[in-house]
Regions:
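Structural recognition of alpha->loop->beta junctions
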Residues: 111-119, 181-202
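Acidic, Mg2+-coordinating phosphoryl-transfer loop and its flanking beta/alpha structural elements
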Residues: 150-190
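Active-site neighborhood of HAD-like aspartate-dependent phosphohydrolases
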Residues: 1-30
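Short, acidic loop-to-helix structural element flanking the phosphoryl-transfer center
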Residues: 66-94, 100-108, 132, 160
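Metal-dependent phosphoesterase signature
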Residues: 41-80, 88
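Conserved Lys-Pro-Asp/Glu-containing loop-to-beta segment of HAD-superfamily phosphomonoesterases
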Residues: 129-159
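Short acidic capping loops at alpha-helix termini that bridge into adjacent secondary structure
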Residues: 23-27, 51-52, 114-118, 146-150
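Helix-loop "lid/cap" segments that line or gate small-molecule binding pockets
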Residues: 14-15, 35-50, 106, 138-139
């Protein structure tokens, strides 16, 4: 899911509400993978150690909750990828650090994701990524051993979690990386530049 536009808009509203100038959407996009931490860092230069961080984090969540399906879409090719997975009778799921407070409405708004065999949110397990627990929970819900799973992610934490869970790992360059990260250095088993590249990997598996 490409939620960067709504993430950025929620953070930018916090700036304009305070009389600060709006920032271009492109400024927020590379930080979308870091969630509220990334958005507040870009909007205000704020880190979690700031005394006002928790209050602004909740304000960001409230802003995002009111508009999280306005501009959010799936990345190009994801719809076709899911259709192909279903035709090949391959199970798939979603593991995210986002709270169920956000993931459940998003899933409801996007019928395509009703075909997911598992959905693991930030509070589904005691630990979030990069801990392997959420990925192991997803594998359990799918009825699969971890070594029969491939985890695709666009953040270094995703690959760390996948490797720790004993899964095949694929780094995706089409997410929010920008020029701030190098997925070739993450230690993933493979790197893809578009969702449909995953089909080619599966054919070789």
């Amino acid at each position: 899911i490409d939620s960067a536009p709504d993430f950025g808009a929620a953070a930018d509203k916090m700036r304009t509400d305070r009389g600060m100038p709006s920032l271009p959407a492109e400024r927020y996009r590379p930080m979308a993978g870091a969630g509220a931490r990334g958005m507040l860092g870009e909007a205000f230069g704020m880190t979690p150690e700031h005394p006002d961080y928790e209050a602004l984090r909740e304000e960001f969540f409230v802003n995002y909750e009111t508009r999280m399906t306005h501009l959010t879409t799936v990345f190009d090719g994801v719809g076709h990828l899911i259709v192909q997975l279903l035709q090949r009778q391959l199970m798939w799921g979603v593991v995210t650090n986002k709270s169920a407070r956000f993931t459940e409405p998003l899933t409801f708004a996007m019928p395509l994701f009703a075909t997911a065999g598992a959905g693991v949110s930030g509070e589904s397990t005691p630990h979030a990524k990069p801990h392997p627990a959420p990925l192991l929970e997803a594998a359990s819900r799918l009825g699969l051993n971890p070594d029969r799973c491939i985890y695709v992610g666009d953040d270094h934490r995703d690959i760390v979690a996948g490797l720790a869970a004993g899964m095949g790992t694929v780094a995706a360059t089409y997410g929010y990386l920008g020029d701030r990260a190098d997925p070739l250095q993450w230690g993933a088993h493979a790197v893809i530049n578009s969702p449909l590249d995953l089909l080619q990997l599966l054919e070789k598996a």
